[in-house]
């Protein structure tokens, strides 16, 4: 402020007796110079610690405008709270601090920025403090008004700023050990560039997010605190997922946006790793961890052991409680902050997070709250009391005449299931009926479905009841239910909403179900409260497993290929398929030619008289022979086309739709699938194809479709 005051004193101490023309000329100069000055437009920034460095990030244009309006109003500014970033953060204007709403995060400083200087090690500009920016602005105003430059200012940190002209302003750092009579600024190293106004620095400022929220998606992470190769948290990865979705809405749902049919989809992260490792288990593990290869052991304890924690009854209870309670808490808070929200809710899980959600969904109840009254809506395997009798089974097989024989021998269904072909022969059952009966009971025995949870006894102690079609070989006595897919016995919390769709990214659900002893998922099974289920994975993902072969074990078919977000297949995949088709065509044509040549070589010669009498037949025969391979190929092609067109029944787990969806690998990934295996498991957060599939399925439930269907 001393330089500003001295400048004002110079103005007041000017010559009191100017020439007659000097006053008017000064006024003219002042008017011309004053017209060049325009107040700077402020923009609001917040500070984030990234890689142990402070990074200043601009608010989007809408949020910055709201903050500026609240600041300019001056009414209760100290206690004013402004929601930003789509309502996920609150800015306390008086404190100049930004707080996360739905998750735990360190508060970040907020600043109203007008002047910037370039940082030391990168090209990013750093804003000056608000107070010093005001000093710079006042000095700049006087310099422009009086057209007097070379202004020198000293910051609170004894740093020197010199305003040479409107386009050249520099910042010098102080030299250690120098005093007021020390070296001049030009001797203090390389100067930094100073800029006025956010429009003069290179920074990306987004327009903002639509206010309307159409759908809410909770995203649950997998093992460890980091979710990608950059060791970012679930919050940062979901931020990327959300940003990709906003871009895709503008490019693939443009018509719906122009007609104001849609707003956006909100993705909120759910963190269970921190509560799990805050129980003190890390201290217990540290005591028994060997001192060698310390970093590797620490990584193992912090990530891979989460899989073992989930298979432990004690820590599994902590995990499912945390996930369910967090989703319920966030959902309640979301409704409080968005009272006009009328959209649906979906859930998504990555890696182990998808298995956690699968187990929670399997153990949900419908709105009636009575598991035993859900038979018609769930369509899952019934208990033993509802299974058909032996007489009904024989009637179904059209073998009712043999019921008297079984009744005479006191053979019920359980005994018949243990009978061999020889046993049935000894009691007088003919060969044909024996084969029918054995095949029927063998099929029933191998048809392993997910079992319904047993009803709770009146005493409150829940003892699971084994069903005839129970998939697990071991019976567990636990606090709550055993649904027959091998989970540890824990009490699964109830969600306060019904998810519409469950998305699994890079999911090991299929592997875990198989290891638990489940051989087959009943085609009629569906989640009690969730209608849709999509298993999305990268072809090189080492953690991902398919689900559809467990529903239809006897049929081999490929998963659904997720279209590229720009349409069609990737070029290298089309080239590969084209070369495969061409090689098959060449192979078929070559085999056909060799077959014709061999037949011509081995065929007996016709008599000359016969050849002369029937030349047309002689010419027609090789033609018909040459047509046979093409006919065969045509038939094979038509059969293949029919097989592709025919729908595949994959059960009701996804409402009759396909379950497994595979991404297209990138061209560079196809060179070495082992090299990109780990990256493939962590690619979903920034995958446009994955995000577009999620958006497409969500908006289809609302009757809104892509501008152009992808092929």
UniProtKB/Swiss-Prot annotation:
Keywords: Cytoplasm, Disease variant, Golgi apparatus, Hereditary spastic paraplegia, Hydrolase, Lipid degradation, Lipid metabolism, Neurodegeneration, Phosphoprotein. Residues 495-700 form the DDHD domain. Residues 30-112 form the WWE domain. Changing residue 351 to A: Abolishes phospholipase activity. Loss of efficient targeting to the Golgi apparatus. No effect on PI(3)P-, PI(4)P-, PI(5)P-binding. Loss of triacylglycerol hydrolase activity. SUPFAM superfamilies: SAM/Pointed domain. Its main location: cytoplasm. The keyword Phosphoprotein applies. It is an enzyme of class 3 (hydrolase). GO terms for biological process: lipid droplet organization; locomotory behavior; mitochondrial fission; positive regulation of mitochondrial fission; triglyceride catabolic process; visual learning. Residues 385-448 form the SAM domain. It catalyses: a triacylglycerol + H2O = a diacylglycerol + a fatty acid + H(+); a diacylglycerol + H2O = a monoacylglycerol + a fatty acid + H(+); a 1,3-diacylglycerol + H2O = a 1-acylglycerol + a fatty acid + H(+); a 1-acylglycerol + H2O = glycerol + a fatty acid + H(+). Widely expressed (at protein level). Changing residue 436 to A: Loss of phospholipid binding and of Golgi/ERGIC localization. It comes from the Eukaryota. Residues 614-624 have a biased composition (Acidic residues). Changing residue 220 to F: Loss of triacylglycerol hydrolase activity. Residues 1-24, 449-470, 609-638 are annotated as: Disordered. It is linked to Spastic paraplegia 54, autosomal recessive: A form of spastic paraplegia, a neurodegenerative disorder characterized by a slow, gradual, progressive weakness and spasticity of the lower limbs. Rate of progression and the severity of symptoms are quite variable. Initial symptoms may include difficulty with balance, weakness and stiffness in the legs, muscle spasms, and dragging the toes when walking. Diacylglycerol (DAG) and triacylglycerol (TAG) lipase required for proper lipid homeostasis in the central nervous system. It cooperates with PNPLA2/ATGL in neuronal TAG catabolism and hydrolyzes sn-1,3 DAG downstream of PNPLA2/ATGL. In vitro, it also acts as a phospholipase that hydrolyzes preferentially phosphatidic acids, including 1,2-dioleoyl-sn-phosphatidic acid, phosphatidylcholine and phosphatidylethanolamine. Belongs to the PA-PLA1 family. SAM and DDHD domains together are required for phospholipid binding. This is Triacylglycerol hydrolase DDHD2. It comes from Homo sapiens. The gene is DDHD2.
């Amino acid at each position: 402020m001393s330089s500003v005051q001295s400048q004002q004193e110079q103005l007041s101490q000017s010559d009191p007796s100017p020439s007659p023309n000097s006053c008017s000329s000064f006024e003219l100069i002042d008017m011309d110079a004053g017209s060049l000055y325009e107040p700077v437009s402020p923009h609001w920034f917040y500070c984030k610690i990234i890689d142990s460095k402070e990074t200043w990030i601009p608010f989007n244009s809408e949020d910055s405008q709201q903050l500026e309006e609240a600041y300019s109003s001056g009414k209760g500014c100290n206690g004013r709270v402004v929601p930003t970033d789509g309502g996920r953060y609150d800015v306390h204007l008086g404190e100049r601090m930004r707080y996360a709403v739905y998750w735990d995060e360190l508060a970040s400083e907020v600043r109203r920025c007008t002047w910037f200087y370039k940082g030391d090690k990168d090209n990013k500009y750093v804003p000056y403090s608000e107070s010093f920016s005001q000093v710079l602005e006042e000095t700049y105003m006087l310099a422009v008004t009086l057209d007097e430059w070379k202004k020198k200012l000293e910051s609170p940190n004894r740093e020197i700023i010199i305003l040479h002209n409107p386009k050249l302003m520099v910042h010098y750092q102080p030299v250690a050990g120098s005093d007021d009579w020390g070296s001049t600024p030009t001797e203090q190293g390389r100067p930094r560039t100073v800029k006025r106004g956010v429009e003069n620095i290179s920074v990306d400022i987004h327009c903002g997010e639509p206010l309307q929220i159409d759908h809410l998606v909770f995203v649950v992470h997998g093992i460890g605190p980091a979710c990608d190769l950059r060791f970012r948290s679930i919050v940062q990865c979901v931020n990327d997922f959300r940003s990709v979705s906003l871009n895709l809405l503008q490019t693939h749902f443009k018509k719906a946006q122009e007609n104001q049919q849609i707003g956006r989809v909100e993705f909120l992260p759910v963190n269970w790793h921190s509560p799990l490792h805050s129980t003190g288990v890390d201290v217990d593990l540290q005591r028994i961890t060997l001192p060698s290869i310390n970093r590797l052991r620490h990584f193992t304890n912090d990530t891979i052991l989460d899989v073992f924690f989930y298979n432990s009854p004690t820590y599994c209870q902590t995990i499912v409680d945390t996930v369910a309670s967090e989703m319920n808490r966030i959902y309640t808070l979301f409704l409080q902050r968005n009272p006009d929200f009328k959209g649906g809710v979906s859930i998504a899980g990555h890696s182990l997070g998808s298995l956690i959600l699968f187990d929670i969904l399997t153990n949900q109840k419908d709105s009636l709250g009575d598991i035993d009254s859900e038979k018609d809506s769930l369509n899952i395997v019934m208990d033993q009391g509802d299974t058909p009798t032996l007489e009904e089974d024989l009637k179904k097989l059209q073998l009712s005449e043999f019921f008297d024989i079984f009744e005479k021998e006191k053979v019920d269904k359980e005994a018949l299931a243990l009978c061999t072909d020889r046993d049935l022969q000894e009691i007088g059952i003919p060969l044909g009926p024996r084969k029918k009966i054995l095949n029927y009971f063998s099929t029933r025995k191998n048809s392993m479905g997910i079992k319904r949870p047993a009803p709770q006894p009146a005493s409150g102690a829940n003892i699971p009841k084994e069903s005839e079609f129970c998939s697990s070989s071991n019976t567990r006595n636990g606090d709550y239910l055993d649904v027959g897919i091998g989970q540890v016995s824990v009490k699964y919390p109830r969600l306060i909403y019904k998810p519409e769709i469950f998305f699994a990214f890079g999911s090991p659900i299929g592997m875990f179900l198989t290891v638990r002893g489940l051989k087959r998922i009943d085609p009629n099974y569906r989640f009690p409260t969730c209608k849709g289920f999509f298993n999305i994975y990268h072809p090189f993902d080492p953690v991902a497993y398919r689900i559809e072969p467990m529903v239809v074990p006897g049929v081999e078919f490929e998963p659904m290929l997720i279209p590229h977000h720009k349409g069609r297949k990737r070029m290298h995949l089309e080239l590969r398929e084209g070369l495969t088709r061409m090689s098959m065509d060449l192979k078929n044509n070559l085999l056909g030619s060799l077959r014709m040549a061999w037949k011509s070589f081995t065929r007996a010669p016709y008599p000359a008289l016969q050849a002369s009498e029937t030349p047309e037949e002689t010419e027609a025969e090789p033609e018909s022979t040459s047509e046979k391979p093409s006919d065969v190929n045509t038939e094979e092609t038509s059969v293949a086309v029919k097989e592709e067109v025919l729908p595949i029944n994959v059960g009701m787990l996804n409402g009759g739709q396909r379950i497994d969806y595979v991404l297209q690998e990138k061209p560079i990934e196809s060179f070495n699938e082992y090299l990109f295996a780990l990256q493939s498991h962590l690619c979903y957060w920034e995958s446009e194809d994955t995000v577009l599939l999620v958006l497409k399925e969500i908006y289809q439930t609302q009757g809104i479709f892509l501008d152009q269907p992808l092929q």
